[in-house]
A protein has these predicted regions:
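Acidic (Asp/Glu-rich) sequence patches and key acidic residues
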Residues: 1-109
Length: 109
């Protein structure tokens, strides 16, 4: 299994093609979850079970992703950190683009 982001009720080509891979379930448990627990994060903690994200939620999620990156610098190997950073950057960039419709909902899980 893997964790990714998709848009619900896709209404155009952009939304049809919106798919952001975040992590395999095992990588999430091994590398993301320790950061989430150590930092007491709320939004990213819901990624493994699944969460609906609206446009107003994006700044909070991006802030948590920044905190995870800072934690990873001190706690992960370079290889794992690079892998995580690549996916976080892609997620951050795509979340900023996802809400071309005000009522769009992104599912992360």
């Amino acid at each position: 299994m893997s964790i990714s982001a998709v848009i619900y009720e896709r209404q155009n080509d952009f939304e049809q093609n919106f798919f952001v891979p975040i992590a395999t379930e095992s990588f999430f448990k091994e590398c993301w979850q320790p950061a989430i627990e150590a930092l007491g994060l709320q939004w990213t903690d819901l990624f493994s079970s699944g969460v609906d994200v609206e446009e107003e939620d994006v700044p909070s999620i991006i802030e948590e992703l920044i905190q995870i990156k800072e934690w990873a610098v001190k706690n992960l190997t370079e290889e794992k950190r690079d892998k995580m950073f690549e996916r976080i950057t892609i997620l951050q960039n795509n979340l900023l683009l996802a809400f071309q419709r005000k009522d769009a909902v992104v599912f992360i899980g």
